[in-house]
Each structure stands twice: as C-alpha cells, then as structure tokens.
From Swiss-Prot:
GO biological process: defense response to bacterium
Designated name of the protein: Caerin-regulated peptide
Family according to the record: Belongs to the frog skin active peptide (FSAP) family.
Compositionally biased residues, Acidic residues: 30-41
Organism of this sequence: Agalychnis callidryas (Red-eyed tree frog)
Signal peptide (UniProt feature, chain positions): 1-22
Key words, A-Z: Amphibian defense peptide, Antibiotic, Antimicrobial, Cleavage on pair of basic residues, Secreted, Signal
Region (Disordered): 24-46
Cellular component, GO, one term: extracellular region
Length: 72
C-alpha cells in the first residue's frame, strides 16, 4: 500500500512539474507575440507620420499653382 502511495505522489508531482513547464512556455510565446504586435503598431504609426508629411509637402507645392491659375 505504501508503494502505491509513493508511486501516486510521484506521478502527481511529475504531472504538476510538466504542467508548470507548459504554462511557462505558453506565457513566453504570448509575450513574444505581444512584442511583435507592438513592433508592428509602431511601424504603422511611423508610416502614417511619413504619409502625412508627404501630403503636406505636396499640398504646399500644389496649392500656390492652383490659386494662381484661378486668379488668371
């Protein structure tokens, strides 16, 4: 009977250790995914800034020509 108790405790202990390791790996994977998402959102924000600067530059050069052609 004592042998069965020890075996059962050993199985439960090994199961808990295995479960703990799996949970830790899962958390690490989730952290990596969050970091990738953060990097992608930073890239998108940077891209929008570049787009707005480009639009501003184009508008700055085109608007004087549009207004001068309307006055003529």
């Amino acid at each position: 009977m004592a042998f069965l108790k020890k075996s059962l405790l050993l199985v439960l202990f090994l199961g808990l250790v295995s479960l703990s390791i799996c949970d830790e790996e899962k958390r690490e994977n989730e952290d990596e995914e969050e970091q990738e998402d953060d990097e992608q959102s930073e890239e998108k924000r940077g891209m929008w800034g570049t787009v707005f600067k480009g639009i501003k530059t184009v508008a700055k050069h085109l608007l004087p020509h549009v207004f001068s052609s309307q006055q003529s």
